Amino acid sequence: MSLLMISENVKLAREYALLGNYDSAMVYYQGVLDQMNKYLYSVKDTFLQQKWQQVWQEINMECKHVKDIMSTLEGFKLDSSPVKTTQHEFPSHDGEVWSLPVPVERRPSPGPRKRQSVQCNDNKSHNNRFSAAAKGPNLPSARNANNVKMKPVRAREKKDALIKNKSSADVSETEVKRFDGSGYDKDLIEALERDIISQNPNIRWDDIADLEEAKKLLKEAVVLPMWMPEFFKGIRRPWKGVLMVGPPGTGKTLLAKAVATECKTTFFNISSSTLTSKYRGESEKLVRLLFEMARFYAPTTIFIDEIDSICSRRGTSEEHEASRRVKAELLVQMDGVGGASENEDPSKMVMVLAATNFPWDIDEALRRRLEKRIYIPLPSAKGREELLRINLKELELADDVNIECIAENMDGYSGADITNVCRDASLMAMRRRIEGLTPEEIRNLSRDDMHMPTTMEDFEMALKKVSKSVSASDIEKYEKWIFEFG
């Protein structure tokens, strides 16, 4: 889409509005708003996208001003209806003045009636009574003439009303659509709408070290179907469910945040507390309502963190009846007769993105519906080095800091463990500086005194204090499960 075309349409809309041709101006304004909406989907830079959204708001405000002017003009047309007069309009009776003779019922010729009207206009005060008497028998024909004149006015009013309704419908299409939750409790809808991430989490793919396979799969499942909808059809339809499996602190939630930032889809962040209610039957309603809202706001990604807490194995002795009903409704909505069908339009897809640290506790039916299962392992040597550079990019490092050596000493550390090491090392210099000082002296320290470079010794001390959180036996369990079910 050409930016020149958008600029020309804005120029034409404003020119028509200045010339008073508001109908044509509204048509161009609506076209510009639709073009800008389509262009926003192709803008990847967040800063540019915010700028375009501001421009869209300004154009939309101009469109509303034109619409208000049209409404005001419409009100003037409705108020200008002719005042009905009575057939015989006689002056009030005066006892000293003879009353006027009754007018003769005859059709006057056009000439004298014209002269009489001219005379009435010139001598209003003198001939007021005579003009009223003379006009009396001609009122029916005058009323017919008014009716003839009103016909095109009413037709024009109907046409303007149709144009106004059409323009208001076009404006409503450009506004943010709202879910119609008739049949559901308003509180349930508001609870789920709070879980829609409308603000930008500001996590990019580049902010996540390593995990190239997981990034590639998520792009294939969410981004590519929106770019190539004609390709992802039939057997090549997008994945409806993706399960991320791995030890704690390996970046599963960060990947979900990157999906919310990069993929430009509606993103529901769901936890077990969202789908839990103390009232009988409301948890199942929440699950059903969640998927109905997801289909309404499609394309949608539903992220369920720690899904094992919601959908653990059925049939165990610890399972409650309410929990079983919630699981059944979730399974039906994901892939049942009335659930998520194979939509022909991949741009209207609903994908479930789940994460868990205990994949062996997940129900077998849910495991089947989460079609793609990917393993998020501990970072490799290259990944650890990249993660160190990401965490330390805002710190001032001493010349003796060797990031490659630090990465080698962190074998077996998860991404969260590496972040904790970097945080602890960055505080070492501050701890040395304030050691032995009173609170008053600490408050009087300058900013330059606090910002001292982090040394290699600080990292060595941090490595001694922060241990790895994942054992070798846990890694074996994850690898065994992904080998069997991945």
Curated annotation (Swiss-Prot):
GO terms for biological process: cell division; microtubule severing. The keyword Ribosomal protein does not apply. GO terms for cellular component: centrosome; cytoplasm; microtubule; microtubule cytoskeleton; midbody; mitotic spindle pole; spindle; spindle pole. ATP binds at residues 246-253. It catalyses: n ATP + n H2O + a microtubule = n ADP + n phosphate + (n+1) alpha/beta tubulin heterodimers. ATPase activity is stimulated by microtubules, which promote homooligomerization. ATP-dependent microtubule severing is stimulated by interaction with katnb1. Residues 84-145 are annotated as: Disordered. Its main location: cytoplasm. Belongs to the AAA ATPase family. Katanin p60 subunit A1 subfamily. Can homooligomerize into hexameric rings, which may be promoted by interaction with microtubules. Interacts with katnb1, which may serve as a targeting subunit. Catalytic subunit of a complex which severs microtubules in an ATP-dependent manner. Microtubule severing may promote rapid reorganization of cellular microtubule arrays and the release of microtubules from the centrosome following nucleation. In mitotic spindles this could allow depolymerization of the microtubule end proximal to the centrosome, and subsequent poleward microtubule flux. This is Katanin p60 ATPase-containing subunit A1. The gene is katna1.
